Structure formats: C-alpha cells, structure tokens
Amino acid sequence: LCSSPYELTRVWNLLAYVSYSLDDLPGAIRYYKRIVESEGAEEEFRLDTRLTLGQFYAATEQYGLAIRQFELWAEKAFIIGSQQRLMMAQLYSILERKDEALKMADIGISEAEAKGEVPKQGFWQLQVPIYYDRDNLEKVTSLLEKLVKHYPKWTYWKQLGGMYGSKERDIDQLVAYDVVYLNGELSSETDVMSMAYMYLGAEVPFRAAKIIEKGMKDEIIEISAKNL
C-alpha cells in the first residue's frame, strides 16, 4: 500500500505508462486524469502530466477535453514551445474556433520570426483554408508564397497558381504551373491542357504545341481532332 498521496501519483504514472505500452490509451488517460486531479502531485509533475493527458485526449479524438488540458497547461507553463502552440492551433481549428486558431498560429509565427527562424509549416498551412473561407484571397496568396519559398511542395505551387489566376496575374500563374509541369507533377489531361492554353494565352504557341505533343506521347492527353 502507498503511504502517501505522492507515492500514489507515482504508481498511477507507472500504470499509465504500462497501459500506453499495451496500446490501452483509455486506460492511460484514466490514470493520468487521476494524477492531475490529485493533491499529492507536485506542481511540475502535474503540469507535465496535464500536457501528456491533452495529447492522449487528442489521439483519441476527444478534442474538447484535449484543448482544455492544453489551456490549463499553458496558463502555468514557463515556456510554450512551437509544437505545443501548433497543436493548440490545430485543436481550435478542428473545434471550429477559428479566431483562436488564427491567433495561436500568429503567436507561433511571430515567436519564430523574432528568433530569426522559419515558422513551422503547419502554422501557415492551417491559416490558408481559414482565410480562403473568409474570402481573404490576398492573405491566402501571401501565405502560399511563404510556403513555396520555405516548404516547396507541388500542391502549394498548384494552389498558388490558382490564386494568381483568380487575380488575373496570368504570367505569375504561368510560372507557378510551369514549375509543377517541369517536375512532372501535372498528371491529368485537364491540367496539362490548361498548361498548354496558358502558353497560347501568353502568345507562345510553339511551347503550347510541345506540351500537347508530349502529353499525347505520355498518354496523358487523348489523341483526338480536338486536341490536335
């Protein structure tokens, strides 16, 4: 038997670890919950456990309970790392608390930039759909430009090309899509034909013809009178 509440919290911590090792997350959550609610836990230990509990709630898709643990942890944490801020921003977004998600992401971005670091990809990534849903296309374009600069992915280039197109920045759209095309990341007939039409619009018919010719050779574009 445990002789003190402190010893009991250590036993619960061990049982939580064993439960986790056996892939029993509900069991681990049950023991971690006892620790954070116990008067026998040291404050620092309680704080660390609260963070773990929040992560486990998130892993079991109990997002409301997860963000509450993160909020209680953040109130007393000496340092809130970028990974924790990102997790909180993602939880707010899942819970449709979009303003809080944006605010948390902005803090994470500002803290990174203040240290001369590149912000985590997830902060910008999270903000794109929120601003898009709010029709703030200028902000979406700005975020995508940062993403292609620091975390270049073809999906970001394609999204950026689409944003340029919606703003009638035709040359910028052409350049963005060309980056994707030249790296073999346009794989549908619609995308490749759109690329060719962009070059026609830019009055470069020879390049457009070459793109269509290659598309047919690669069996992406159907050989038809319409496409010849």
PLM features: what roles do these ranges have?
Residues 2-4, 36-43, 71-79, 107-117, ...:
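Solenoid-like repeat scaffolds
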